[in-house]
């Protein structure tokens, strides 16, 4: 039985899974919103929230830890300069996941994952495009 097992294995070994999560986090930081499978989004959420918690500290040590986790100085710079200041008033829940239905090719459940602060919600964007 898999009681109290918190990790999503995603059908990959440990190094592949950690590289996948780091790359997804880097893309989320750079693009502010990404479309991926629901399970990958659920696996990414705690990783991304821990990155924001580190970035809100703003120390040199926190910056080095973030760079070590996501392997990108550019993304770390964006995280510290743009995203973390928007989240200063928020205690947790930095990431929002929208379910988007199934992918046509293989039927995988898809999701949209984005930052909660500083974003125009998906429904409002559709309404703006219609006008």
UniProtKB/Swiss-Prot annotation:
GO terms for cellular component: cytosolic large ribosomal subunit. GO terms for biological process: translation. One of its GO terms (molecular function) is structural constituent of ribosome. Keywords: Ribonucleoprotein, Ribosomal protein. InterPro entries: Ribosomal_bL17 (IPR000456), Ribosomal_bL17_CS (IPR047859), Ribosomal_bL17_sf (IPR036373). Signal peptide: none annotated. It comes from the Bacteria. Pfam families: Ribosomal_L17. SUPFAM superfamilies: Prokaryotic ribosomal protein L17 (SSF64263). Part of the 50S ribosomal subunit. Contacts protein L32. Belongs to the bacterial ribosomal protein bL17 family. This is Large ribosomal subunit protein bL17. It comes from Methylacidiphilum infernorum (isolate V4).
């Amino acid at each position: 039985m898999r009681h109290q097992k918190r990790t999503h294995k995603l059908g990959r070994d440990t190094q592949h899974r950690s590289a996948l999560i780091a790359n997804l986090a880097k893309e989320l930081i750079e693009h502010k919103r990404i479309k991926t499978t629901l399970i990958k989004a659920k696996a990414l959420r705690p990783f991304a929230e821990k990155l924001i918690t580190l970035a809100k500290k703003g120390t040199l040590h926190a910056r080095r830890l973030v760079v070590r986790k996501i392997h990108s100085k550019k993304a770390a710079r964006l995280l510290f300069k743009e995203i973390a200041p928007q989240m200063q008033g928020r205690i947790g829940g930095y990431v929002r996941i929208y379910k988007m239905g199934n992918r046509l090719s293989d039927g995988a459940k898809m999701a949209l994952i984005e930052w909660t602060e500083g974003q125009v919600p998906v429904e409002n964007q559709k309404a703006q495009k219609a006008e």
